[in-house]
């Protein structure tokens, strides 16, 4: 396959393909596509199976 011949991983190939498609979209569709890449990550500290604290990784705020 072409991605193997280029010496890149399949994940990198998919990322390049997705970026290429996203850049070729019209502005209204591009905004909707960019919103899909937003993700929220949180870390929860557990003690005895119960959540003790939650930390939002994006803003480093504890909840």
Curated annotation (Swiss-Prot):
Cellular component per GO?
Answer: mitochondrial inner membrane; proton-transporting ATP synthase complex
Which CDD domains did the record assign? F1-ATPase_epsilon
Q: What does this protein do?
A: Mitochondrial membrane ATP synthase (F(1)F(0) ATP synthase or Complex V) produces ATP from ADP in the presence of a proton gradient across the membrane which is generated by electron transport complexes of the respiratory chain. F-type ATP synthases consist of two structural domains, F(1) - containing the extramembraneous catalytic core, and F(0) - containing the membrane proton channel, linked together by a central stalk and a peripheral stalk.
Complex formation: F-type ATP synthases have 2 components, the catalytic core F(1) and the membrane-embedded component F(0), linked together by a central stalk and a peripheral stalk. The central stalk, also called rotor shaft, is often seen as part of F(1). The peripheral stalk is seen as part of F(0). F(0) contains the membrane channel next to the rotor. F-type ATP synthases form dimers but each monomer functions independently in ATP generation.
On whether Ion transport is a keyword of this UniProt record, the answer is yes
| InterPro entries recorded | ATP_synth_F1_esu_mt, ATP_synth_F1_esu_sf_mt
Tell me one Pfam family matched here: ATP-synt_Eps
User: What's the family?
Assistant: Belongs to the eukaryotic ATPase epsilon family.
User: Where does the UniProt annotation locate this protein?
Assistant: Mitochondrion inner membrane
GO terms of molecular function: proton-transporting ATP synthase activity, rotational mechanism
> From which source organism is this entry?
Pichia angusta
Instruction: Cite the entry's keywords alphabetically.
Output: ATP synthesis, CF(1), Hydrogen ion transport, Ion transport, Membrane, Mitochondrion, Mitochondrion inner membrane, Transport
- What's the name of the protein? ATP synthase subunit epsilon, mitochondrial
**Gene name, Swiss-Prot/TrEMBL:** ATP15
Main location, first listed in the record:
mitochondrion
Q: How does it sit in the membrane?
A: Peripheral membrane protein
């Amino acid at each position: 396959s072409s991605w193997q011949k280029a010496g890149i991983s399949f994940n990198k190939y998919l990322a390049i393909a997705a970026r290429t498609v996203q850049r070729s979209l019209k502005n209204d569709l591009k905004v909707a596509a960019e919103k899909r890449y937003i993700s929220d990550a949180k870390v929860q500290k557990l003690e005895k199976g119960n959540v003790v604290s939650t930390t939002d990784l994006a803003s480093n705020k504890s909840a």
